[in-house]
């Protein structure tokens, strides 16, 4: 209690704020300029520094509260909060698990449309499937008052759904009912259940909300089951294999029901994500995004899920503010949809609103605390503001939630360990854990590049042999490079010059073709620049790096644009122009989403710059402050 009550108050106010007649404002230390870099230094004596006075007062307050205060701090629970647990599948076929899970999701999404309720996301409750935990424990873990549980039995063209609403604290059954109807009435059953629960919880239902809940997405139930399978894989992880399975199921659903707007919208989202992650940036993939999105808009332009797909596409085209408008419009219709808060947060840290972004992610986390993907994004929000302790905390939560699919959590955690501690061995150990549990392509590429940058060329080649992809991300997704470049670097380091020359030539040909295929993609230009740099084609390397940066500067995207600055800096470093490399890095130094001196000191890709006089001078000033 002492620590909880005293220290956070002292730390938050003392380290961040000053009291002024206008209220609390951020504390600013004296500014010292060193070789063009601004470094904050507080030169006042210890006893005159407000942060230390507040810290002392916080300790005293904590002791007083611990001695005389209450015995515990209780977590408040919203009186109209609910979690819909995965319904039990009482059907004979295991294939009906997707069908049963789909009903759970539909009822959850219906309730999420009711502004008067707080509804835990479907992603967070699926971990309780087949759980033997008591209702009160589950409710405490999810922070809700009510639990809805039920069962589904599908037999031929009939479906029986049983549901009961429980006040978890008192273990009192607030509502229960059963429905035994034809499969064609499924959506009406789900709507009836949702409205009955809302009434039992005394939630206000508007006519608009009722109309949304009663909307029928398709008359083809077989297509709808395939659609639900697709959504399961779409939101399962960031892995390419899951996205590919989602694509297959969406396509099957569309084959059965060519007028299924939501299936087209979902397919467009997955294709968009495959491009965004760098798995396939071909023009053909881009055409598939546009075709499916346009088809969805043509079929049902005002559907919230279609508008959500449109917002996602606008976002990925970096039309951020139109995307924000679409997201906010959908949020009015789906106020409990954590995905929308998450998407708004993504925009915010791309338009330099990092604190606002993190706040939205934390709000989303409250209603979706068991989603590994969302938890990773919360960790990234902290990492972008250089709070590595909190970042690692959330990455660990994601890994514990889903150790076999949270590939990005291992990767980001590995980065944070390097940045915070400079612990190269532990960083690689975390990557190895991720590779062992997930076989993730990006983790294998990250380990390969780190080993090569450390001069462990044979180990790098052995690691790369575990992943057969032609291309991979480099410099945190700032560039796409071919595997032949890494092989050339390794063989060159091993003294096998002829082999190195062969692979460098292949890398050059492949990247030039990539640029020709995707001339507007910043990552391909940056990747070609990196290849040219390693071939000592200096002018060409700089030109490609500058082109990548011109396509996506930080002013256009304060998240990914920073990586283009890094790519150009890396190119300058490889060709031996270290001053120009440092000039580039200086433009993103100590800004949220950028880099700190820890990046230069601890990340192996910047090892050539560590002993540069400018870096030494900056570090000396940092230590003195």
Regions found by a protein language model. Give the residues of each.
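An N-terminal, helix-rich hydrophobic module
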Residues: 1-63
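TPR-adjacent "capping" and linker segments in tetratricopeptide-repeat scaffold/adaptor proteins
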Residues: 76, 209-228, 298, 473-479, ...
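Proline-centered turn/helix-capping motifs that create local helix->coil transitions or kinks
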Residues: 198-209, 300-301, 458, 539-542
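Short coil/linker segments at helix-helix boundaries
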Residues: 223-352, 366-377, 383, 549, ...
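Alpha-helical protein-protein interaction modules
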Residues: 314, 327, 331-332, 356-625
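Catalytic-center loop of serine/cysteine hydrolases
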Residues: 45-46, 51-79, 93, 103-249
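Short beta-strand segments enriched in small/hydrophobic residues
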Residues: 80-90
């Amino acid at each position: 209690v002492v620590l909880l009550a005293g220290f956070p108050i002292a730390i938050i106010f003392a380290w961040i704020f000053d009291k002024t007649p206008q209220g609390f404002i951020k504390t600013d230390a004296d500014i010292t300029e060193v070789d063009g870099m601004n470094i904050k230094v507080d030169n006042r004596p210890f006893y005159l520094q407000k942060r230390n006075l507040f810290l002392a007062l916080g300790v005293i307050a904590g002791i007083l509260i611990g001695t005389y205060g209450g015995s515990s701090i209780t977590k408040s629970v919203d009186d109209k909060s609910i979690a819909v647990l995965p319904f039990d599948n009482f059907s004979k076929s295991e294939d009906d698990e997707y069908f049963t899970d789909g009903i759970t999701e539909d009822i959850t999404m219906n309730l999420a449309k009711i502004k008067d309720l707080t509804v835990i996301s479907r992603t967070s409750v699926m971990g309780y499937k087949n759980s033997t935990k008591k209702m009160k424990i589950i409710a405490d873990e999810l922070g809700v008052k009510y639990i809805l549980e039920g069962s589904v039995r599908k037999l031929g063209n009939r479906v029986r759904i049983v549901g009961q609403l429980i006040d978890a604290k008192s273990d009192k059954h607030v509502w229960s009912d059963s429905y035994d109807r034809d499969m064609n009435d499924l959506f009406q059953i789900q709507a009836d259940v949702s409205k009955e629960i809302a009434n039992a919880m005394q939630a206000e239902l508007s006519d608009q909300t009722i109309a949304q809940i009663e909307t029928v997405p398709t008359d083809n139930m077989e297509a709808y089951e395939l659609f639900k399978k697709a959504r399961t894989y779409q939101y399962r992880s960031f892995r390419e294999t899951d996205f590919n399975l989602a694509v297959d199921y969406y396509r099957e659903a569309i084959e059965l029901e060519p007028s299924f707007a939501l299936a087209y919208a979902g397919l467009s989202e997955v294709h968009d994500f495959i491009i965004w992650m760098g798995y396939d940036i071909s023009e053909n993939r881009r055409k598939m995004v546009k075709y499916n999105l346009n088809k969805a808009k043509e079929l049902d332009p005002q559907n919230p899920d279609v508008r959500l797909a449109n917002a996602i596409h606008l976002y990925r085209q970096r039309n951020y503010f139109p995307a924000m408008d679409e997201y906010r419009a959908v949020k009015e219709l789906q106020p409990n949809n954590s995905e929308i808060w998450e998407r708004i947060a993504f925009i915010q840290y791309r338009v330099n609103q990092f604190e606002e972004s993190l706040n939205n992610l934390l709000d989303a986390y409250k209603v979706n605390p068991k989603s590994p993907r969302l938890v990773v994004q919360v960790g990234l929000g902290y990492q972008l503001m250089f709070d590595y302790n909190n970042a690692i905390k959330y990455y660990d939560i994601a890994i514990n939630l889903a150790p076999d699919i949270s590939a990005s959590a291992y990767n980001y955690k590995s980065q944070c360990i390097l940045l915070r501690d400079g612990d190269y061995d532990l960083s690689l150990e975390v990557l190895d854990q991720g590779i062992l549990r997930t076989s993730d392509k990006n983790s294998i590429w990250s380990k390969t590049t780190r080993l090569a940058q450390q001069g462990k060329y044979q180990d790098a080649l052995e690691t790369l042999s575990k992943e057969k992809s032609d291309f991979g991300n480099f410099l945190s997704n700032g560039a796409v490079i071919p595997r032949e470049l890494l092989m050339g670097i390794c063989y060159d380091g091993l003294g096998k010059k002829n082999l190195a020359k062969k692979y460098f030539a292949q890398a050059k040909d492949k990247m030039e073709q990539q640029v020709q295929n995707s001339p507007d993609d910043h990552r391909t230009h940056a990747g070609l620049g990196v290849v040219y740099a390693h071939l000592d084609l200096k002018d060409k390397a700089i030109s490609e790096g500058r082109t990548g940066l011109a396509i996506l500067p930080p002013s256009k995207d304060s998240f990914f644009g920073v990586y283009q600055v890094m790519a150009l800096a890396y190119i300058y470093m490889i060709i031996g122009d270290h001053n120009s490399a440092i000039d580039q890095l200086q433009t993103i130094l100590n800004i949220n989403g950028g880099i700190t001196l820890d990046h230069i000191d601890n990340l192996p890709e910047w090892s050539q710059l560590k002993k540069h006089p400018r870096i030494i001078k900056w570090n000396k000033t940092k230590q003195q402050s």
